[in-house]
Structure formats: structure tokens, C-alpha cells
Amino acid sequence: MKTLTMIEMQGCPYCANAHRAIDALRAEGGAYAAVPVDFVDENRETERTQPFAGKYYYVPSIFMDGEKLYEAQPGQDYDKIYAEVKRAFDAVGTDGTR
């Protein structure tokens, strides 16, 4: 199964909502429970963000194989973030492909 990479920042309210959405999706069970997510803190792990340089501005941003699947936008509420995180999880697919 492919891994999602989520670039985030400590203290970011949109990142907190993305984590909340991930927890909710995993709690549903099934394929969502198995989706691996690699969390990268933009401030503490700058070297790990280098492959994504120029591909995002806002956090959280979610990537799969270097392709951006989601980038939060100012003002997004939990429902919008949940829908976008779910879309990213769905992109992984149950067999590890899109």
C-alpha cells in the first residue's frame, strides 16, 4: 500500500483538524484503518520537506509519490478538511494503487 505524506506544523489549527479527520477515518475501520501516513513537521524536519519544495505553501499538505493531493486553505472548516483528507485516503485505494 502506498504511503501518504502529510506536511504539518505544530500549533497549526488546520493540521489539528486534519489529524482529527485521520483519527475519524481510521476509527471507521476497513481500508481507512490501514492507510499509512508519514507525518513531517515543517519546522523540525526541514530536510524531509526538501522533496516538496515549491509544491505547497499552506499546511497541512498531503502528498502521495510526490504528487500533491491536498493543501489546506485559510478559512477551511473541519468538514472541508475531513472531505479532502478522505479524498486523499481514497486515492491510496484498497490495493495500494489509485
Question: Over which residues does each language-model region extend?
Answer:
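A short, structured beta-strand/loop element
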Residues: 52-59
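Non-catalytic interaction surface on structured domains
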Residues: 19-22, 30-34, 51, 64-67, ...
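Non-catalytic, surface beta->alpha helical segment in thiol-disulfide oxidoreductase systems
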Residues: 58, 64-97
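Thiol-based oxidoreductase modules, predominantly thioredoxin-like and allied folds used
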Residues: 8, 32-47
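Alpha-helix termini
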Residues: 26-32, 92-96
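Short, glycine/acidic-enriched loop or turn micro-motifs at the edges of active sites
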Residues: 11, 44, 68
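Local sequence-structure signature of Cys/Sec-based thiol-disulfide redox active-site neighborhoods
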Residues: 1-28
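Residue-level recognition of the N-termini of beta-strands and the immediately preceding loop/turn
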Residues: 2, 34-38, 98
